[in-house]
């Protein structure tokens, strides 16, 4: 279930963060979410999962989630406790996979430092950075917000089916 606004501490990454560094290929044979969580961002920040706290936010540059179209990448981030990903842009397949697994995200070009506490308002399409202002991002369409609110595509479809039965 999506929380809004999302307030959390920033983990900052650059451009072209590919799915191979988000979750290295050697972990793809498992379906154990704890293994995904334990190795999230390992390819670029080996200490990430030891230091990240539930509710933290990843802020990145352009083309976040590029590379192979592995659904495990947003799952690893989500199960590591990351509440949201904000990036200048996302690889399209990562963007949809994140929505489908219920990982909130927003395209926005914001100024912040690692460790800053920021507020992401998905409903308004804004990111508030104390001392730097409010940055306007790309607000998600309502149908994608509905999927996130329901916890991902599978939960969203189950909810719709249950409503049809009533």
Swiss-Prot record:
Pathway stated in the Swiss-Prot or TrEMBL entry: Organic acid metabolism; 2-oxosuberate biosynthesis
Keyword Lipid metabolism attributed: no
Function noted in UniProt: Component of a hydro-lyase with broad substrate specificity for cis-unsaturated tricarboxylic acids. Catalyzes both the reversible dehydration of (R)-homocitrate ((R)-2-hydroxybutane-1,2,4-tricarboxylate) to produce cis-homoaconitate ((Z)-but-1-ene-1,2,4-tricarboxylate), and its hydration to homoisocitrate ((1R,2S)-1-hydroxybutane-1,2,4-tricarboxylate). Is also able to hydrate the analogous longer chain substrates cis-homo(2)-aconitate, cis-homo(3)-aconitate. These reactions are part of the biosynthesis pathway of coenzyme B.
GO biological process, alphabetically ordered: coenzyme B biosynthetic process
Highest taxon above the source species: Archaea
The UniProt record lists the keyword Coiled coil: no
Name of the protein in question: Methanogen homoaconitase small subunit 1
GO molecular function, one term: homoaconitate hydratase activity
Motif (YLRT): 27-30
Coiled coil start-end: none
Gene: hacB1
Keywords annotated in UniProt: Lyase
Annotated site, Critical for substrate specificity, chain positions: 29
Catalytic activity: (2R)-homocitrate = (2R,3S)-homoisocitrate; (2R)-homocitrate = cis-homoaconitate + H2O; (2R,3S)-homoisocitrate = cis-homoaconitate + H2O; cis-(homo)2aconitate + H2O = (2R,3S)-iso(homo)2citrate
A Pfam family matched in the record: Aconitase_C
Record text on subunit structure and interactions: Heterotetramer of 2 HacA and 2 HacB proteins.
Family to which this protein belongs: Belongs to the LeuD family. LeuD type 2 subfamily.
Enzyme Commission number(s) from the entry: 4.2.1.114
